[in-house]
Amino acid sequence: KHLGSPDYQKAITQHKSYIKALQSCGLEVHVLESCEDYPDSTFVEDVALITPKCAIFTRPGAESRRGEVEQIETVLRDQFDNAERVEAPGTIEAGDIMMVDNHYYIGLSDRTNIQGAEQIIGILNKYGYTGSTVNLKEVLHLKTGLSYLENNQLVICGEFKNDPIFSRFDHIDIPEEESYAANCIWVNDNVLIPTGYPLAKGKIISTGYNVIEVDVSEYKKLDGGLSCLSLRY
């Protein structure tokens, strides 16, 4: 479904509100300079995976995005003692990676191939973590339809609901008509969700969380979700 072209000024305003929402949860937010050469670079989550022990720079499946990795590497390399990199022929975007404690689920998608996933798992193993793959059928990225909160609680939608891989979790089921809200962010006992999804909001509140709504309608038009807009560590 085509949602129309994004309104640039509205997107800027929404981005500022997103930053304020993260700050209201107690996070220190580092805002990067705009990178006009790479229009997708606002979706900063995809180009690096940050773990407690290392930073892993990815190799996006969208060739037009590969230059973004160098930009983020320049910013982050000095902040981590251990930095790793995914190499060709592997491709991976971190929107396909969901961390649950010390285990990482990796979606195999149009953007993430098995070579990229295997490289990530090898790196994770080196630092004492584990990883496994999930085949995607419909969504762009794994976290388009899944968000892990804490305490075994998983926000889940669509193709993942009946997947036995996720049967061990306590599900917060998001109805198909509000599937965009399945991409949300848990931050210090708060859950950030996109504005305008009352059923999803109610379900998450009923689980005991404080919900903060953030309008990201202009980023939805670009297939971007809440988690895509930040690297959290």
Predicted feature residues:
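The feature marks the mature, well-folded catalytic cores of soluble enzymes
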Residues: K1-Y233
